Amino acid sequence: MSSSISSLASAPTLSTNASTSSIVDQLVQAYVQSISTPVYNMQAQVSSINSTISVYQMLKSTLSNLQTQASDLSQIGTLSPLAAQTVTSSDNSVVTATAQPTATAGTHSISVSQLAKSDTLVSNELTQSGTSISTATGAGTFTFSITVNGKATNVNVNVAAGDTNSTVLSNIASAVNSSGAGVTASVVNDTSTTSRLVFQSTNTGSANAISVADVTGTLLQNVGWTSSVISSRTASTSTGAGYVNTSTSTLDANFTLDGIPIVSGSNTVSNVLTGVTLNLAASQASTANPVTLTVGPDTTAIQTTLNNFISKYNSVVSTLNTDITDTTSTDSSGNQTVNRGSLAGDVSIMNLQMSLENVVMGQVSSAASGGPTSLSAIGITLNNDGSLSISDQSKLNSALTSNPSGVIALFNSSSGVATQLNTMLQQFTNPGGVMDQKINGAQDQVTQMNNMITSMQQSINLQANAMQQEYSAYESTLIQLSQTQSNLNNIWSGMASSGMAV
């Protein structure tokens, strides 16, 4: 019997502690992995749909850019960017000009005999360090008025006893410049010891002739601007007060346009030729040849507009080609894999691609009589990849110069290229349009799938927790059994050592 006791005492103990916990964790993790496959698959689907959403958003952006360009080109009349006009001058040193789309093409002759000038009023020459002004006026605040273009402005100037002429002139200039009277005042040091006060009208022309008068005191009178000097527009001299231009008529620009004499108070003239602004730069001798102004289509600006249109159209084509075309890749072993386009099989997108090609390749039934009826007629053709390019620059240049209205109608008439594109693309890019429907539908799908993923993960977590608890209970039982075994082993060992028989 002692041998039996010895056998019991030496029986293997039940395994517990850290090794059991590790095994339990591994079992639970393996179980979670085995039932998480649907979650992983759905997460992959969500990632794929999100990629598709990004593709839709990028496509919508490129379509919107083209739609905006098409909308501009479909504008009627002078609103069309293709109606841009320009003016060339045979002598830019005499006159330049700019044109709005409302300008009428044609040639004009202009001769400039006099430029518009600002009115200039100059004071007496005064010794800078002298006190003749302050001595004559005495100390105090003095008011004078400045009248320009029918508006009188009162100006107040403080004079202190003993102020030098330099100080008084500076104070007058400062007060005038902050008055908003339409006059710029400055002090000119004509010698090292003398100065003169100068008033100059801000704007040119006889309407802006300067008139000044003392209101209180004799401040202006003491710089030489007496009432007689002002009323008679006395000419200034090297030392005496007066006007640089004694006649107000010399303040206006004088020119002839197409033989018609014109007087303007400004050298910038925008009310003579419709849509044209003249910029007079220099007067001419009476014997000089007239300057020729030519108004016509701004081919440079129009070319830029057409290039922008082609660029935006080609961006759409490039995006569509990438999104709906399957590609084939070959690995190092020569195995080929077909990569499906992100939007391959999307019928509405594929139809859009075909519709775009039909518009830019088709004939425009509403084209102007005698004008181009297709893009190819002005040198713009379709390439093999569906993109547009200017294949014949000379043909385009000829169309822009010989029939600009026909080119405009090719785009903006009722069935014009831009009109058709604008109508078509609005269906895709407008709020709630095709692209928004696709994006919103895909986003709703992602939301639903994410909710399902959350629900499945919660279920998996519950199952994992239940399994963890079950194994924990099993481990607790093992610990109790192990303790019982240990106690029994101790008892049997004690009995065996005392020689007790059982």
Regions found by a protein language model. Give the residues of each.
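C-terminal low-complexity, acidic/polar tails when present
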Residues: 367-372, 473-501
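Acidic/histidine-enriched alpha-helical segments
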Residues: 190-195, 322-342, 466, 487-498
